[in-house]
Amino acid sequence: MAQNLSLEKDKIRFLMLEGLHDNAFKVLSEAGYHNVENIKTALDPEELIEKIKDAHFIGIRSRTHLTRDILEKAEKLIAIGCFCIGTNQVDLEAARELGIPVFNAPYSNTRSVAELVLAEIIMLMRGIPEKNAVVHRGG
């Protein structure tokens, strides 16, 4: 179970998976956290167990699945950051039982969704779907 710890910043280990934005690493570095491992992809369960066992914090997106088995082997884990909308990739009951808080970024896609809506409005106003269909039919 995660304990209340007071660790020096240079001893706190971050495991960041799935190509998180470079700003995350800049913010951590500026705050004095330099023990940050950045892996651009999700890991298979065996690799994840090996990497997470010494991590205090893990940052993930939607491809990494933190099961009860994985969380129980993460003895030093203090918190889980889901840098995505949901937390369904984390066994929340196991995290709660182990005293590991889980947080997410529920509005991380807001700007992208707004941009897409505006682009689709413009596309519909200009009749692009109809014109596209005509071109594909050879007309």
Where are these regions (language model features)?
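An N-terminal-biased, well-structured beta-alpha scaffold segment characteristic
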Residues: M1-F103
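Phosphate-binding beta-alpha-beta segment of Rossmann-like dinucleotide-binding domains, i.e.
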Residues: L98, P106-G139
